[in-house]
Amino acid sequence: GPLANLSIKLKQDFLYYWLSEEDNLILCGKLDWLEYLKEIEAVHIIDFKTSKKEENPTSLQLPIYYLLAKNCQSRPVEKLSYWYLEYDTMPTRQDLPDETESKNKVLEIGRKIKLARKLENFNCPNGKDGCLYCRDLERVSRGEGEKVSESSRHDLYFVERDKPTED
């Protein structure tokens, strides 16, 4: 498989570049794997997936990785793939995103996040009940979590789950 092939070792694990100097927005992220396609002097971005659930086709993860690879290293991006480790023996190739469209989408979201931070107004698009990704964080911010560990980079909180009701 691709892991036995040549790969690109980037100078830094965490890639970043100015998405918009005018808006003071930097795009950053970490690529799982960059396979080197020697015969065409290009790269293949592989994103390892540990979940059994397939990635949403509208996810911006691969477009973000594409922008990072395009702007943080010199070789063209020839291929993008998800590799679902639970059930695939090889990566599943995805379409290359349009660079301009990807940049515009990411920039639009970056501007919204920047404005929300400035106004301290973090409204979840899923309404007052929040979403799977922010419910626990919101509970911690309301003081409902118990801090159980602290390090220079992370704080760990325990949040008790609501017990399901029986009908």
Task: List PLM regions with ranges.
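RecB-family 4Fe-4S metal-dependent nuclease core
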Residues: 1-167
